[in-house]
Amino acid sequence: MEEDGLNNRNWGYYEPSQFRPNLGFQLIPSILDRNEKPFLSPHSQNLNFITPSNVYGGGSSSVVSYPRDYTVSDAPFMSYSWLNQHKDSKFFSNVPEVSRMTQSMQLLQPEVVTEVDESVKRRHCSGGQRGGVPKVKKEKKLKDNNMPRVQRERSPLLRKCIEMVINGVSMDIGGLPVPVCSCTGMPQQCYRWGCGGWQSACCTTNVSMYPLPVNTKRRGARIAGRKMSQGAFRKVLEKLSSDGFDFSNPIDLKSHWAKHGTNKFVTIR
């Protein structure tokens, strides 16, 4: 078949692809590019390969035909077997080795599980030992009803030791009996008020009765009785000591209350 017969190229020639060739491969150049070098190396020139001189030997009748399997090579395909052969390259140095990571992860998992199991076993063992040992119960002491009970004295006479110098004599006023007030005809014990002071339980400046009426302004409380401070009570003691009063008896404060309700600022003469 002649070259210009049907305006078709011979089937023995390879037309370069329109796509950009891969960097790792080199395809057979077109026959029209006469300045290109042959595909094979110059050492293998004795082999039969396509060159412009071999194709156009003399004329249209000297066209050489070769089998397609010999002239055109198979389409290249990507092989992933070469990835593991370039371990020292700069590109693959940053790629982590997946197989080694998976193996290390598989080895670490059973170790963590064993540690957890050991800790759980220790807890169970410790708990079992604690639970197995019975607690020793303390024996309750039985009360003997025949033994006499010692009652604590809660007498109002038991007070702190408060020493005061009265007319040159040291006196412990904490040991004195509780003063009383006989304004109602019956002596009633007074209440402690402040530090060493006393308060009446049966009289005010207007009322004299026992018990005192309930305070209307404060629920659950009664009207406050007359008051006497520690300083005023000390003056009462000085007066009674000068009169030769026996302090073993309770002091009657009926005549010693102040007219305005308190002896805090009253001077007794």
Swiss-Prot record:
Transcription regulation is among the record's keywords: yes
One MF annotation (Gene Ontology) recorded for this entry: DNA binding
GO cellular component, one term: nucleus
Pfam families (alphabetical): GAGA_bind
Keyword Isomerase: no
Tissues expressing this chain: Expressed in seedlings, leaves and pistils. Detected in the base of flowers and tips of carpels, in petal vasculature, in anthers, in young rosette, in the lateral and primary roots, and in the gynobasal portion of the ovule.
Source species, domain of life: Eukaryota
Intrachain disulfide bonds: none
Subcellular location: Nucleus
InterPro entries in UniProt: GAGA-bd_tscrpt_act
Keywords assigned: DNA-binding, Nucleus, Transcription, Transcription regulation
Annotated family: Belongs to the BBR/BPC family.
Purpose: Transcriptional regulator that specifically binds to GA-rich elements (GAGA-repeats) present in regulatory sequences of genes involved in developmental processes.
Protein's UniProt name: Protein BASIC PENTACYSTEINE3
Gene source species: Arabidopsis thaliana
Gene name for this UniProt entry: BPC3
